[in-house]
Amino acid sequence: MPSAPQKTKSFRLQTKYVFLTYPRCSSSAENLRDFLWDKLSRFAIFFIAIATELHQDGTPHLHCLIQLDKRSNIRDPSFFDLEGNHPNIQPAKNSEQVLEYISKDGNVITKGEFKKHRVSPSKSDERWRTIIQTATSKEEYLDMIKDEFPHEWATKLQWLEYSANKLFPPQPEIYQATFTEEDLQCHEDLQLWRDQHLYHVSVDAYRLVHNVTLVEAHSDLVWMDDISRNLEGLEPGSPPSTSADQVVPERQHGPEASEGTITGMGPSTSLSMMTTRPTTSSTTSPSNSSHSGSN
């Protein structure tokens, strides 16, 4: 029993903007332009652009954009066939984008005047636009997408959150101080700290200048601090100083001189004060004087 003949797909082209592609076409762009211009004259054709593009094997194929003044109603699938070359036929939804695409290599010929036309947005685009324009917060934006486009919400949530942050940038948090203004006030005795640290001559620094023992250096510094405080034993007009290379007044030694702590220009922290007024020497430290002896 013979098989029933297969039904051919019905063809119908209803549009004012047509995009044709002739693969491996042996005809020239000029022949195709003239052929289509004549064939579409009943639809009041006003623009046509044809571009030639080469395949990797060197054979050409032709792209064609057609703009009509009247909507076509073509039912014959072979309507655009030229010399045995059958094209791929599509409506050109956006003539400007099609013309830009076929002109990318610059090998294009045209006839007539190109006209931009309004491109009707898809229903999906309209729904997205409504969400973008009506949402008032990031949460509402994502909820609306979840309702309208659940598949996109489930598979592209990371990108949707990115767009939500662009539409509704996070507001910076107001800084709340964890301390009061009173905490910023300095309560330390800076003068005492200055005297004990900035104007302080250490035992080690003193011994770098004077060849004395650790005990002698300690004793000398305590004695100099006492002298600086009461201004005794210094020449008139000489300011007190604990500089390690100063000319130090000579003094007599006693066991009490080794007591106390090392101090600087601040208040004396000696555990005992000298009661004997020392004699002065213009060339040696107190310890050096004691080492040289006296007659």
Swiss-Prot record:
Source organism phylogeny:
Viruses, Monodnaviria, Shotokuvirae, Cressdnaviricota, Repensiviricetes
Keyword Transcription included in the entry's annotation? no
Question: Of which family is this protein a member?
Answer: Belongs to the geminiviridae Rep protein family.
Q: How is the cofactor bound?
A: Divalent metal cations, possibly Mg(2+) or Mn(2+).
Q: What EC number(s) would the UniProt record show? A: 3.1.21.-
Q: Show the ranges annotated as biased composition (Low complexity).
A: 267-295
Q: Which residue numbers does the motif RCR-3 cover? A: 101-104
Q: What class of enzyme is it?
A: hydrolase
* Comment on protein domains: There are 3 rolling circle replication (RCR) motifs. RCR-2 may be involved in metal coordination. RCR-3 is required for phosphodiester bond cleavage for initiation of RCR.
The record's subcellular location field reads: Host nucleus; Host cytoplasm
* InterPro entries given in the database record: CRESS_DNA_REP, Gemini_AL1_MSV, Gemini_AL1_REP, Gemini_AL1_REP_central
**Keywords of this entry:** Activator, Covalent protein-DNA linkage, DNA replication, DNA-binding, Endonuclease, G1/S host cell cycle checkpoint dysregulation by virus, Host cytoplasm, Host nucleus, Host-virus interaction, Hydrolase, Metal-binding, Modulation of host cell cycle by virus, Nuclease, Nucleotide-binding, Nucleotidyltransferase, Repressor, Transferase
Q: What is this protein called?
A: Replication-associated protein A
The residues covered by the CRESS-DNA virus Rep endonuclease domain are 12-114
Q: Which organism is it from?
A: Tobacco yellow dwarf virus (strain Australia) (TYDV)
